[in-house]
Amino acid sequence: MVFDMHKLQKLSVLALKLNSKIVSAESCTAGLLSASLTEIPGSSAFFEQGYITYSNNSKTSVLGVENKTLKKYGAVSEQVAKQMAKGALKRSNSTIAISITGIAGPGGSDYKPEGLVCFAVTKINGKTRTETMEYGPIGRSKVRS
């Protein structure tokens, strides 16, 4: 798989230790995070489900991302990543949600270039942490991984 399996293994150990279940909400990665998590033996003990919400319409209809947030900040923003994570958590029996939205390329703009990826992690009754990474024009496959 494409994600750093060592880091995902550490995440799985932590989730098991906390008796937590993980849900993912993915846009630009189109399910690669979910696929990578389920490569870990015993993943059914910590991974519940994943949502692939590639279009803006699916972000609103499936995860409850607000149209006004999409219009104001764009699909690739920490604000949308946060709403994706919170929406996934609300619609699942999980206690931890991870979301990813970005511009895999080609394309982008000066304001939101190719390789821009926004992440959010939230837990039930907890804070949401967001982060934006700029990987640059390294190609779709590398941005998505």
Regions found by a protein language model. Name each.
Residues 1-145:
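Short alpha-helical segments enriched in small residues
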